[in-house]
């Protein structure tokens, strides 16, 4: 995010698709390579020590990004314990597209940051090697089902998409926004005009929001999902769908910005942690007193063609271990996949995820991967027809 609570550092978000920026880092036109092997940050030129090199593709904001205590702890500790060099690379654009382009001559050993939408895509292309990690015994089976039932991607963190809203808007609606339904936006021009979304044709957060809305309409309302967009899109002025999450949140958090933005339910906890509790809150989609949301699940996978399968597996085991999982809530601002790891008390500011019914359970990763191209094409047709020029 390029705007944040006063006095707080910029909060990173993962970069997994074209147009999506992190709160701290932007990907350069070429991959940035960072080496971690107990020597800090440096370009890896080869040490001549005969130690193996593990190449990891991920997003620039992982564990706060290079140089942070959490990032260095995760990679340096593993490198020292296993006598291995680690190259962390941040490919431009989409992780799946990078892996697919290199499929005939794989470069990476591991990929961190695939989600419930991109992981099944990677699996469909044969890009991943399944691994049934022992640590999955402490991971809820639901998370595994939602990202990769075949263990091609192993979940390490999760969360929920949310609709963030300002305290001022909550007051104007007498608190009604806290239990908003999608039909509330479809039938209220004021609400629709104050909702800033991300363009799903270029942004992963936008894709996830589109899937959330579709599943809500199909599973909860049993209605045509296009009705929502045809009703709200004519009011997308001046706040047209943003090209990425960072742009959207920056606009939301700037003076005179929209009252609501599609983001993540952990945002209020982040704001409270950095000294502005209640600056904004977050909600999911409600109906008849029940909360429904879209669960985002992030995983790590072994790249098909890796030359270091045993090291790959040991790194995944490390990523699921308590010491690493403890770093997730205050660095990734997500929930740890390891259910034995507690989240800090500041998460009381976020909506209780235990009270949200995940819409993911009504579909499967494979179904989403197969349906997404058609959904995006339909969305684009609606946008062309209804969004004001």
Region spans (language model):
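Periplasmic solute-binding protein
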Residues: 116-127, 145-177, 206-216, 295-301
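Secretory targeting signatures
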Residues: 1-49
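Ligand-binding pocket segment of bilobal, Venus flytrap-like solute-binding proteins
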Residues: 212-287
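Conserved C-terminal helix/tail region of periplasmic/extracytoplasmic solute-binding proteins
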Residues: 358-389
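A structural signal for short loop-to-beta-strand junctions that line the ligand-binding cleft
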Residues: 106-114, 129-168, 183, 193-200
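Mature extracytoplasmic/periplasmic domains
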Residues: 298, 303-363
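Early extracytoplasmic/lumenal segment of secretory-pathway proteins
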Residues: 49-121, 250
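Short beta-strand->loop
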Residues: 128-138, 153-154, 183-186, 273-294, ...
């Amino acid at each position: 995010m390029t705007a944040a609570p006063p006095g707080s550092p910029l909060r990173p978000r993962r970069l997994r698709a074209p147009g999506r920026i992190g709160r701290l880092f932007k990907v350069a036109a070429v991959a940035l390579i960072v080496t971690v092997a107990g020597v800090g940050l440096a370009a890896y030129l080869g040490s001549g020590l005969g130690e193996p090199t593990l190449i990891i593709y991920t997003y620039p904001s992982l564990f706060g990004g290079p140089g942070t205590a959490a990032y260095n702890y995760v990679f340096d500790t593993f490198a020292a314990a296993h006598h291995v060099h680690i190259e962390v690379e941040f490919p431009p654009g989409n992780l799946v597209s990078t892996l697919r382009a290199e499929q005939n001559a794989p470069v990476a050993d591991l990929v961190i940051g695939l989600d419930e939408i991109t992981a099944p895509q990677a699996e469909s292309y044969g890009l991943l090697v399944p691994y049934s990690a022992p640590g999955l015994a402490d991971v809820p089976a639901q998370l595994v089902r939602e990202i990769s039932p075949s263990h091609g991607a192993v979940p390490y963190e999760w969360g929920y998409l949310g609709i963030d809203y300002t305290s001022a808007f909550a007051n104007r609606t007498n608190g009604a926004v806290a239990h908003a339904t999608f039909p509330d936006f479809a039938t209220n021009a004021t609400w629709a005009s104050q909702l800033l979304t991300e363009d799903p044709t270029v942004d992963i957060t936008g894709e996830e929001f589109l899937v959330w809305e579709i599943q809500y309409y199909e599973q909860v309302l049993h209605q045509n999902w296009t009705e929502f967009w045809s009703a709200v899109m004519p009011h997308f002025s001046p706040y047209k769908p943003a090209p990425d999450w960072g742009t959207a949140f920056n606009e939301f958090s700037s003076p005179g910005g929209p009252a609501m933005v599609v983001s993540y339910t952990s945002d209020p906890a982040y704001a409270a942690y950095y000294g502005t509790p209640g600056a904004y809150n977050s909600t999911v989609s409600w109906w008849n007193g029940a909360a429904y949301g879209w669960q985002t699940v992030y995983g790590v996978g072994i790249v098909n063609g890796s030359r270091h399968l045993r090291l790959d597996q040991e790194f995944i085991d490390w990523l699921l271990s308590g010491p690493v999982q403890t770093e997730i809530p205050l660095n990734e601002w997500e929930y740890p996949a390891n259910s034995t790891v507690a989240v800090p008390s500041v998460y009381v500011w976020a909506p209780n995820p235990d009270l949200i019914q995940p819409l993911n359970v009504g579909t499967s990763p494979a179904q989403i991967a197969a349906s997404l191209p058609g959904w995006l094409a339909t969305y684009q047709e609606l946008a062309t027809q209804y969004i004001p020029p």
